[in-house]
Amino acid sequence: MKITRLAVVALMGFAGLLLSGCGEEAPESTGPPPPAPAEYADKHMPAGWWADEKILAEGKEIFEGVKNIDVNCASCHGKDGKPVKAGARDFRKGERMKQYSDSVWFWRISEGVPNTKMKAWKSKLS
């Protein structure tokens, strides 16, 4: 099974949200997130990844910057999902985070989020 780093990071971010961009919290919108554009609409996590300990462990290493020092989600979002940088989304807000589909995770991690500090990561994750 080919594991793409982007998929693992998206999975790790989402898994962290279910289980549970300095200092101040980002304002949270109350409506549902926008749908992913067409080029991301068919992006989904492979079957079985949500329960695969090896995949989750690799995702954790990517999320925390262990596998690649140029990619460290936790530097903004915190190791436990609590933001450590201004403007970072609080991943501990499970009800909000459950609204994000796999395709939205792929899109936002790949392309970043306009008008925020969340940059595009697709050049660092494949």
What are these regions (language model features)?
Residues 59, 68-79:
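The canonical Cys-X-X-Cys-His
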Residues 1-9:
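Bacterial N-terminal signal peptides that target proteins for export
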Residues 23-25, 84-93, 108-126:
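Axial heme c-ligation environment in periplasmic c-type cytochrome domains
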Residues 50-52, 74-110:
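Gly/Gly-Pro-rich "capping" loops immediately C-terminal to redox-active cysteine motifs
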Residues 64-68, 95-98, 121-125:
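Flexible gly/pro/ser-rich segments immediately N-terminal to CXXCH heme-c attachment motifs
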Residues 27-65:
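Electrostatic cytochrome c docking/interface patches
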Residues 54, 58-61, 100-104, 120:
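Extracytoplasmic/secreted proteins, especially bacterial periplasmic and envelope-associated proteins
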Residues 18-21:
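C-terminal motif of bacterial Sec signal peptides marking the signal peptidase cleavage site
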